[in-house]
UniProtKB/Swiss-Prot annotation:
Name of the protein this chain belongs to: GTPase Obg
Gene Ontology terms: biological process: ribosome biogenesis
Enzyme class: hydrolase
Binding residue positions for GTP: 166-173, 191-195, 212-215, 279-282, 308-310
Enzyme Commission number(s): 3.6.5.-
Binding site for Mg(2+): S173, T193
GO molecular function: GTP binding; GTPase activity; magnesium ion binding
Matching PROSITE patterns: G_OBG, GTP1_OBG, OBG
Domain of life: Bacteria
Organism: Cereibacter sphaeroides (strain ATCC 17025 / ATH 2.4.3)
Domain OBG-type G: 160-327
CDD domains associated with the record: Obg (cd01898)
Subcellular location, record wording: Cytoplasm
Keywords: Cytoplasm, GTP-binding, Hydrolase, Magnesium, Metal-binding, Nucleotide-binding, Plasmid
């Protein structure tokens, strides 16, 4: 499946139908009076988060969504038919942004969450509405309200509990494949991963979701490599797992490169809880492992896990550390949503 996480969409709600000018005409009724009906309301445009989608690719092939207008009113007090609403079905985690590309209109983070993007125009009044004690036969009606034209951006930020970070070929996809049901492409060359991948991880009877994004390189914030736009997909994560290639001779520099890109990206990403793991220890001798782990711990100021995605060494320890951070974040979120009771 092709992946698309940003697209521009043009929407228009339907206009209201015009009111009707009509008078009752029946045999033996000389002054039947007005009986013009109202116009129907125009269709509205909505966005709704649905299950089963993880890309915005459908919006590459259709960018224009125009709701139908309401039908005009008719005689005998008949109201025109209202236009049908249009619902844009988007993946959970989609942000809806105004045309200025800065103002967030809505953030759809739950299945079934819905937001009104453009209200349909009201139908015009028929002449029956204008009947009064002083005007028994009004000969006027209102036109319907026009629809609303709007341009919006849809931006997808995948919802995951943990995010994988690292330089290209740090072993992120191998780690994801070894710990989850995901089967990302794995090869011995940089930028094997071109789009984000999600995997469900199980540890001690608990499950959480890990997101693997394409590797970052120095200058990614300036557009080098694949850029840093994929970092948006780990913004919602509770914890980040930073994988460092233990076979690299510049292991400390590699670590600092990723940290620098996180800081350059901005937002709260650099301040998120972070776990560091030195990968590929199956290709290192014990002394190399000890020396490079010590150097990395000095640079990070904290514990560094040693793992091998290929051999499966140390993976459960890292997963338990990730779960501890995720479980704590979920507990804090529950406390924030507890309703107040006297």
């Amino acid at each position: 499946m092709k992946f698309l996480d940003l697209c521009k969409v043009y929407i228009r709600s339907g206009g209201g139908g015009g009111g009707c000018v009509s008078f009752r005409r029946e045999k033996f009724i000389e002054f039947g009076g007005p009986d013009g009906g109202d116009g129907g309301n125009g269709g509205s445009v909505w966005a709704e988060a649905v299950e089963g989608l993880n890309t915005l690719i459908d919006f590459r092939y259709q960018q224009h969504f125009f709701a139908k207008s309401g039908q005009p009113g008719m005689g005998s007090q008949r109201t025109g038919k209202s236009g049908e609403d249009i619902v844009l079905k988007v993946p959970v985690g989609t942000e809806i942004i105004d045309e200025d590309e800065e103002t967030v209109i809505a953030d759809l983070t739950e299945v079934g969450q819905r937001i009104l993007l453009a209200q349909g125009g009201n139908g015009g009044w028929g002449n029956l509405r204008f009947k009064s004690s002083t005007n028994r036969a009004p000969a006027r009606a209102n036109p319907g309200q026009p629809g609303i034209d709007r341009t919006i951006w849809l931006r997808l930020k995948l919802i995951a509990d943990a995010g994988l970070l690292g330089l290209p070929n740090a072993g992120k996809s191998t780690f994801l494949s070894a710990t989850s049901n995901a089967r990302p492409k794995i090869a011995d060359y940089p930028f094997t991963t071109l789009v984000p991948n999600l995997g469900v991880v199980g540890v001690d009877g608990k499950e959480f979701v890990i997101a693997d994004i394409p590797g970052l390189i120095e200058g990614a914030s300036e557009g080098r490599g694949l850029g840093d736009q994929f970092l948006a997909h780990v913004e919602r994560c509770s914890v980040l797992l930073h994988l460092v290639d233990g076979t690299s001779s510049t292991i400390v520099k590699d670590y600092r490169t990723i940290i620098g890109e996180l800081e350059a990206y901005g937002g709260d990403l650099a301040g998120k809880p972070r776990i560091t793991a030195m990968n590929k220890i199956d290709a290192m001798d014990p002394r190399q492992i000890s020396d490079r782990r010590r150097a990395l711990e000095k640079a990070t100021g904290g514990k560094v896990f040693t793992i091998s995605g290929v051999a499966g060494t140390g993976l459960m320890e890292v997963l338990r550390a990730l779960w501890a951070e995720i479980d704590g974040a979920r507990g804090d979120a529950v406390e924030e949503h507890v309703p107040w009771q006297p």
